[in-house]
Design a protein with these regions (language model features):
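Alpha-helical segment of the N-proximal tetratricopeptide repeat
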Residues: 3-33, 42-50
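"A position-specific structural signal for the A-helix of alpha-solenoid helical repeats
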Residues: 9, 43, 77, 111, ...
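Register position in tetratricopeptide repeats
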Residues: 16-17, 50, 84, 118, ...
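A conserved position within tetratricopeptide repeats
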Residues: 31-32, 65-66, 99-100, 133, ...
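Alpha-helical adaptor scaffolds
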Residues: 39-107
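TPR/TPR-like (Sel1-like) alpha-helical repeat modules
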Residues: 117-141
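Terminal, low-structured helical/coil segments at or just beyond the last alpha-helical repeat
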Residues: 134-161
Length: 161
């Protein structure tokens, strides 16, 4: 493994452990030419999100959407940043304008469900969440603790008691 690839792999590992400063150190040691790589941008984005630096993260996610318009990841992250900045209606719109490949991701349906719940659109929320749970049953466990779904908690539990 070349040094840049080793550093990128190390940075990914640090992000997974929540060690954002260490991940940034690995990325900082990369040659300048590597900073434009999609995987490096994604790791930087995850660091910003982990540090709750939502505006910077959104700007980087939007850049990723422009660079990789067919890839769903940038759209999911950008919408999440908007939601965290209390711009949930914009988050819904952003995801709605994303590529068709988004609709293959359970995270798309889960996040749409959360955003609709936050806006009080409970029936729409439940429909999106049900689709997410069909695609990835583990999301049901996550939903039990998700504060965005507090208003729907009893209905979600009743559906699968």
């Amino acid at each position: 493994m070349t040094d840049p690839n080793r550093r990128i792999a190390a940075a990914q590992g640090y992000v997974e452990l929540g060690l954002h400063a260490e991940a940034r150190e690995e990325l900082a040691a990369l040659p300048v030419a590597a900073h434009g790589r999609v995987d490096v941008i994604e790791i930087t984005l995850l660091c910003l999100m982990g540090e709750r630096r939502w505006e910077e993260a959104f700007a980087l996610a939007a850049k990723l959407c422009q660079q990789e318009p067919a890839e769903p990841g940038g759209f999911i992250h950008a919408a999440f940043c908007l939601h965290e900045m209390n711009r949930t209606a914009e988050a819904l719109d952003f995801l709605g304008r994303g590529p068709a490949s988004l609709r293959t991701k359970p995270e798309y349906f889960y996040n749409m469900g959360c955003y609709h719940a936050s806006l009080g659109h409970f029936e729409q929320s439940l429909a999106y969440l049900e689709r997410a749970f069909e695609m990835d049953g583990d999301l049901r466990l996550h939903a039990r603790k998700d504060r965005d779904l507090d208003a729907l908690r009893a209905r979600l539990e009743a559906q699968h008691a």
